[in-house]
Amino acid sequence: MKDRLEQLKAKQLTQDDDTDEVEIAIDNTAFMDEFFSEIEETRLNIDKISEHVEEAKKLYSIILSAPIPEPKTKDDLEQLTTEIKKRANNVRNKLKSMEKHIEEDEVRSSADLRIRKSQHSVLSRKFVEVMTKYNEAQVDFRERSKGRIQRQLEITGKKTTDEELEEMLESGNPAIFTSGIIDSQISKQALSEIEGRHKDIVRLESSIKELHDMFMDIAMLVENQGEMLDNIELNVMHTVDHVEKARDETKRAMKYQGQARKKLIIIIVIVVVLLGILALIIGLSVGLK
């Protein structure tokens, strides 16, 4: 009876262990499902930002091609800029959160962790790529707007250098160059465009500054990942070198081994021949006696 009780207890313990393993597997599966859900959401956000960037580039072109752009076009651009910033912040926060969880689980090396690292790296690089394109579009728009201001100032008889123009933009006061413009119809139109372009640049620079810290944050993350990947690549290259070196050494060893074997066979043959000759001499000597 006592033995039977011990068997039942042992069986129960085994069942409990199995249950724990099932619970761990279920918990891990649920966690990875949640992780992939976040990955998909973040990827869609990045794709949406990419679409918005292309739309913004079109609006930049429209604004630059019109002497006095439509207010609606500028409003559309403002809404688009706000949407890009909102989505970009959301993506940045998601990536930072993923990075934190990965660092916390760094002590446990597992297939899941490698998958999470890989997915996080891919998304981070994609995000930086999209935001770099956006930054390039903004800088291009600023330079072309600045060029338009410079041309309009020339129309009014005021020639400015790039340094002087930058000074005006940094001061936020276009009156530095527009205060003495002659009161004529052409000058008024030029003045209106100068002031409008100046406002566009001021608004744009505000957006660039807001995105700068976030961009640098993610860019640094990707740079660190790049160093990690470079280290991995370097280790792989070293490993390949070691393998090639070992292969060459093995070939040389086999060659030397083959040569040594040939020498050994020759020596054996010579010894056998000598022994044969010696035996023949002894035999003849005995026969003569």
From Swiss-Prot:
Native species: Rattus norvegicus
Annotated GO biological process: exocytic insertion of neurotransmitter receptor to postsynaptic membrane; exocytosis; intracellular protein transport; intracellular transport; long-term synaptic potentiation; membrane fusion; modulation of chemical synaptic transmission; neuron projection development
Function recorded in the entry: Potentially involved in docking of synaptic vesicles at presynaptic active zones. Apical receptor involved in membrane fusion of apical vesicles. Essential for survival of retinal photoreceetors.
PROSITE patterns the UniProt entry points to: SYNTAXIN, T_SNARE
The name this protein goes by in its record: Syntaxin-3
GO function terms (MF aspect): arachidonate binding; SNAP receptor activity; SNARE binding
Tissue specificity as recorded in UniProt: Heart, spleen, lung and kidney.
Keywords in alphabetical order: Coiled coil, Membrane, Neurotransmitter transport, Transmembrane, Transmembrane helix, Transport
